[in-house]
Amino acid sequence: SSAASDVYKRQKEELLEYKRCMEDPLHFIQTYVKIVSLDEGLIPFKMYNFQKEMVGTFHNNRFTICKLPRQSGKSTKMISYLLHYALFNPSVNIAILANKAATARDLLGRLQLAYEHLPKWLQQGVMSWNKGSLELENGSKILASSTSASAVRGGSYNIIFLDEFAYVPSNVAEQFFSSVYPTISSGKTTKVMIVSTPHGMNMFYKIWTDAEEKRNSYIPIEVHWSEVPGRDEKWKKETIANTSEQQFNTEFECEFLGSIDTLISPSTLRRLTYRTPIQSNAGLDIYERPVESNTYLITADVSRGTKNDYSAFIVFDVTSVPYRVVAKFRDNEIKPLLFPQRIHQVAKVYT
């Protein structure tokens, strides 16, 4: 009958389209993903050129770090790609981690909304659906949480998406990478995507600068505010008038310096370069080995050792001006009673 042949024809077309969506995340996102616009409600996700390039980079690389201006649609394209990955890759685990749990859950909520508005033939059966996680019939799971080490420790993940990573406190960011990174690097296809607007010189800054200098495996992606349609010099002047030049430089020019108040002026910090230690072990970084005839000085600062503030000391070579940092130590777990022993061990080497 013609009705039966119509059904067959439709099913065949849907199968071909399903295959195309599976192979081409950009086609899937631009054709089927819906987003909520403040002005127009639910609309198709029309991507900017830089967003298309970013999806290609995510898809073809394992490690990506993105330095993006505010309101550049960064979260939308990320969750669109994660939705594609979960639908077309069975039994994968995906973690959406943000500086606040509420932000991560909001991102998962947007992903769930996009899923609900997909055509039925693109959807999977849903095994569980709540504010903090989603599990599909193909065995793929998505977890939303804050970027604390306990959130994903012990689990194995195929994609870890770190949103606004520069706003995660330094001690949490470092703990996260030391405890979670081994589970990431053990997989051959695991992807890590770090996305943020800069916020001072912290772990995001270090990973970004190392990526630019090709000292790590991350592909750095930078987007200038002028690449977002509708943003021109007039918009820039208006934004600065409504906020401040410093805020604009941080949130839209994506400058690391000046994004938080620092004791040393931004211009001085900008002249300083990051040095790779010749040796690192248990919180101690060594930049230069001791020279017998030289004079050394140690400055120390103690904390409680409760995983918040760091106990730290710096070893300076003060033989001649300018003084040089030759070693540094920092640890937020070492107890105040043990800290002097650690200082003494290093002091003996540099005498």
Q: Predicted segments — roles?
A:
Residues 12-67:
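Conserved pre-motif I regulatory segment
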Residues 92-111:
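Conserved Walker A/P-loop ATP-binding site and its immediately adjacent core
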Residues 1-8:
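Short, small-residue-biased leader/transition segments that mark boundaries at the very start
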Residues 175, 227-302:
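ATPase catalytic-site recognition across NTP-hydrolyzing enzymes
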Residues 108-158:
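Inter-Walker segment of RecA-like/P-loop motor cores
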Residues 113-117, 123, 167-243, 348:
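ASCE P-loop NTPase helicase motor core
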